[in-house]
């Protein structure tokens, strides 16, 4: 899988370098540099074709739009992953707290019902396969 990304990264680096060189040629254009300009334009077209060929290998990869927003804002896209993990951890802790509360409530409810309806709760525990009161 990383091989696909390495291949794309290589093509993107070449493309960016050709764009940089094209910018240098264009910023100080002389009629004598027309051949070099044409060559760079051809390299850019070829580079775009190479990048497009990589697309077929990566068609199943999706990138959240928020990552592009981070990049547009000049932020590190890895911060997006970090913040997603932090949100997931916080949500996980919140859900764990709810689960623990529900387990405690169930235990207290069964204890209370066992005191008020001991025979019915004995039947309930036998149906559930529980031999004892939960603590």
Swiss-Prot record:
Molecular-function GO term, any one: transcription coregulator activity
Family of this protein: Belongs to the Mediator complex subunit 10 family.
A Pfam family this chain is assigned to: Med10
Subunit structure: Component of the Mediator complex, which is composed of MED1, MED4, MED6, MED7, MED8, MED9, MED10, MED11, MED12, MED13, MED13L, MED14, MED15, MED16, MED17, MED18, MED19, MED20, MED21, MED22, MED23, MED24, MED25, MED26, MED27, MED29, MED30, MED31, CCNC, CDK8 and CDC2L6/CDK11. The MED12, MED13, CCNC and CDK8 subunits form a distinct module termed the CDK8 module. Mediator containing the CDK8 module is less active than Mediator lacking this module in supporting transcriptional activation.
Keyword Magnesium: no
GO CC, any one term: mediator complex
Keywords linked to the UniProt accession: Activator, Nucleus, Transcription, Transcription regulation
Keyword Transcription regulation: yes
Biological-process GO terms, alphabetical: regulation of transcription by RNA polymerase II
Protein purpose: Component of the Mediator complex, a coactivator involved in the regulated transcription of nearly all RNA polymerase II-dependent genes. Mediator functions as a bridge to convey information from gene-specific regulatory proteins to the basal RNA polymerase II transcription machinery. Mediator is recruited to promoters by direct interactions with regulatory proteins and serves as a scaffold for the assembly of a functional preinitiation complex with RNA polymerase II and the general transcription factors.
The organism's place on the tree of life at top rank: Eukaryota
Location of the protein in the cell: Nucleus
Protein name in the entry: Mediator of RNA polymerase II transcription subunit 10
């Amino acid at each position: 899988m990383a091989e696909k990304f390495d291949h794309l990264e290589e093509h993107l680096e070449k493309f960016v370098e050709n764009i940089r060189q094209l910018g240098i040629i264009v910023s100080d254009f002389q009629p004598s540099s027309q051949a070099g300009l044409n060559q760079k334009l051809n390299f850019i077209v070829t580079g775009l074709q190479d990048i497009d060929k990589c697309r077929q290998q990566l068609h199943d990869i999706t990138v959240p739009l928020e990552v592009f927003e981070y990049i547009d804002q000049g932020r590190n896209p890895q911060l997006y992953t970090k913040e997603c993990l932090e949100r997931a951890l916080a949500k996980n802790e919140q859900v764990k707290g709810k689960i623990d509360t529900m387990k405690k409530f169930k235990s207290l409810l069964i204890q209370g019902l066992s005191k008020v309806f001991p025979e019915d709760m004995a039947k309930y525990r036998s149906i559930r396969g529980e031999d004892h009161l939960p603590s």
